[in-house]
């Protein structure tokens, strides 16, 4: 059991690390963030016995955006609707925050904070 928990922790942390790296590199397109986000949400909701749809539906457009390319690659560009990496990560954060798991997001994301308007602000320091 302890080995399974350790494997889960390592895999889950790796998803967050992957997401942060993809976010930070300018050469990486916005759509590359969606797969690790979807995998993080699926893992998090399953591990915590939460309904994934309910978790995402508290943020307008999140479920649709984060499900893009989960079954087909054809619609990915059309579905982004011009969202920036910052807007995508904001939606991702909002899903955690609106489900009362904002501290969980910060534990894994690293250096960031929320401004007085509820916007996620990234730190310029390495995490």
Model feature map: region roles:
Residues 1-127:
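Acidic, Mg2+-coordinating catalytic modules of nucleic-acid enzymes
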């Amino acid at each position: 059991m302890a080995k399974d928990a350790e494997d889960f922790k390592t895999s889950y942390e790796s998803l967050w690390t992957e997401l942060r790296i993809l976010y930070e590199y300018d050469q990486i397109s916005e759509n590359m963030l969606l797969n690790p986000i979807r995998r993080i949400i699926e893992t998090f909701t399953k591990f915590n016995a939460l309904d994934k749809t309910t978790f995402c539906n508290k943020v307008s457009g999140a479920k649709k955006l984060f499900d893009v390319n989960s079954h087909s690659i054809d619609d990915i560009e059309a579905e982004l609707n011009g969202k920036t990496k910052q807007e995508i990560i904001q939606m991702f954060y909002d899903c955690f925050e609106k489900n009362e798991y904002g501290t969980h997001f910060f534990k894994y994301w690293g250096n960031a904070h929320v401004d007085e308007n509820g916007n996620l602000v990234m730190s310029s320091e390495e995490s």
